Amino acid sequence: MEKKITPSELELNEFIKIINEMSGIDLTDKKNILALKLNKFLEGTNTKNFSEFLGKLKSNRQLKQETLDFVTIGETYFLRELAQLKEIIYYAKSLEKRVNILSAPCSSGEEVYSLALLAAQNFIKDMYILGIDINSSVIEKAKLGKYQGRTLQRLSESEKRRFFLESEDKFYTINKNELCTCKFELCNVFEEKFSRLGKFDIIASRNMIIYFDHESKLKLMERFHRILNDKGRLYVGNADLIPETIYFKKIFSPRGVYYEKV
């Protein structure tokens, strides 16, 4: 029987600090749940104790990625918060030009493909959607575009027939011929690579900011502002609290709330 690797209070706090520095995510409120889940994760890291794990985490690039994958696992599904997705597409269509959209984080691709699906239904062809995430496993799943089960539950049968290819094992694979250009990249919003992604008309950052501390939120707003085109829009999740900054103004419209680049 393998010995459990249990972190001390100080070690757990150090782990939370490292994750915050790497990603902006604040896990302080999830400390108790984290302590319970960490042991199983540590079994696959080939470390003798938590102190050794922390040492490796600071220098081992692969372990950093595996750890980020571990702490950023979340549930998502097609057409989540549908009213807001429709508003994004309504605004995109009103621009009457090629529209670039960034989905950050994109998780396993459901949000990106949902936007592309809605764009196709609204006869929008000249659109580019880039999905980014710091979790390498979900990025690979998004690129594959293969889904089954609960994540598809909000799609109609006609949508499945048009936008997916069904296999005998009940998996549904995205039919990319029916959609606009959708791409996915492994990217941390706080790293230099983010600044080189290009310019966007719309950023959908839903249900990520809720996990950031105040300082990280402010930093993120500045970075979003930098890659948005003039009058570009930021759409966030219902639970995301956005600090007041010089970069965006909050707009209340009949179709919902969004943040416009100042």
Curated annotation (Swiss-Prot):
GO biological process annotation, one example: methylation
Gene Ontology MF terms in the entry: protein-glutamate O-methyltransferase activity
Residue positions binding S-adenosyl-L-methionine: 76, 80, 111, 133, 188-189, 206-207
Keyword Plastid among UniProt keywords: no
UniProt EC number: 2.1.1.80
Keyword Transmembrane belongs to the record: no
Protein name: Chemotaxis protein methyltransferase
